[in-house]
């Protein structure tokens, strides 16, 4: 384990040693004219690397995307968000233009529906909506009290010897056998008290 650590450190040192200083004027537009090493510190007597970016980011208020410059942020806003200002934007990350619009009235919504599906359906739906509003949004049907009463009146589900629920509406095989004519007498097993089902 120590040998592998030593080899990895040795490889890093070797890679650092191969990064030799660039010769003066070796590349066109070389900012290091005196042959300084890239990233050298000023304390070594060499000129520092010119800083292109100060490390701060500008975040988009809508989608929180980071940008290095204000110009890039403005271009992003124009392209992706339609150049909306921070005050004009709503909450959330959506970019849809319809979401920020005010809610349409019921009449406008029904008019739009009418153009799509036909006047008869919309008129009927409008009447139903009016009736629901008059009734206090209570849809026709059973009340909660009535539903609770029906649940209470349900018979208790019997369980058979295997732990499965026995359906009450379907007669057992023995009951079906008893319903046939001439089969109303007890079977020999039942006479002995053995509850064997047919």
Curated annotation (Swiss-Prot):
Secreted effector that translocates into the nuclei of host cells to reprogram the expression of immunity-associated genes by binding to effector binding elements (EBEs) in rice. Binds the 5'-CAATCTTC-3' EBE of promoters from targeted rice genes and probably recruits a yet to be determined host repressor. Causes ambivalent immunity with increased susceptibility to the hemibiotrophic pathogens Magnaporthe oryzae and Xanthomonas oryzae pv. oryzae, but enhances resistance to Cochliobolus miyabeanus, a necrotrophic pathogen. It comes from the Eukaryota. Keywords: Host nucleus, Metal-binding, Repressor, Secreted, Signal, Transcription, Transcription regulation, Virulence, Zinc, Zinc-finger. Disruption phenotype: Does not affect vegetative growth, conidiation, conidial germination, nor appressorium formation, but leads to significantly reduced virulence to rice. This is Host transcription reprogramming factor 1. Residues 1-19 form the signal peptide. One of its GO terms (cellular component) is hyphal membrane. One of its GO terms (molecular function) is DNA-binding transcription repressor activity, RNA polymerase II-specific. GO terms for biological process: effector-mediated suppression of host innate immune response. Its main location: secreted. It comes from Pyricularia oryzae (strain 70-15 / ATCC MYA-4617 / FGSC 8958). It is found in: Secreted; Host nucleus. Induction: Expressed during multiple stages of host plant infection, including prepenetration, early biotrophy, late biotrophy, transition and necrotrophy. A zinc finger (C2H2-type) spans 58-81.
């Amino acid at each position: 384990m120590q040998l592998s650590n030593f080899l990895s450190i040795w490889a890093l040192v070797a890679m650092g040693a191969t990064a030799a200083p660039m010769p003066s004027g070796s590349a066109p537009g070389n900012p290091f004219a005196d042959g300084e090493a890239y990233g050298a510190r000023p304390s070594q007597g060499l000129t520092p690397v010119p800083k292109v970016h100060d490390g701060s980011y500008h975040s988009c208020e809508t989608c929180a995307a980071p940008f290095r410059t204000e110009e890039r942020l403005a271009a992003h806003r124009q392209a992706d968000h339609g150049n909306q200002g921070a005050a004009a934007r709503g909450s959330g990350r959506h970019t849809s233009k319809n979401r920020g619009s005010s809610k349409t009235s019921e009449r406008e919504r029904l008019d739009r529906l009418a153009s799509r599906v036909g006047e008869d359906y919309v008129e009927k739906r409008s009447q139903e909506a009016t009736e629901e509003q008059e009734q206090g949004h209570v849809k026709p049907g059973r009340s909660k009290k009535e539903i609770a009463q029906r649940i209470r009146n349900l018979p208790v589900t019997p369980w058979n010897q295997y732990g499965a629920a026995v359906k009450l509406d379907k007669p057992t095989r023995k009951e079906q056998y008893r319903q046939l004519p001439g089969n109303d007498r007890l079977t020999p097993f039942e006479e002995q008290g053995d509850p064997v089902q047919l």
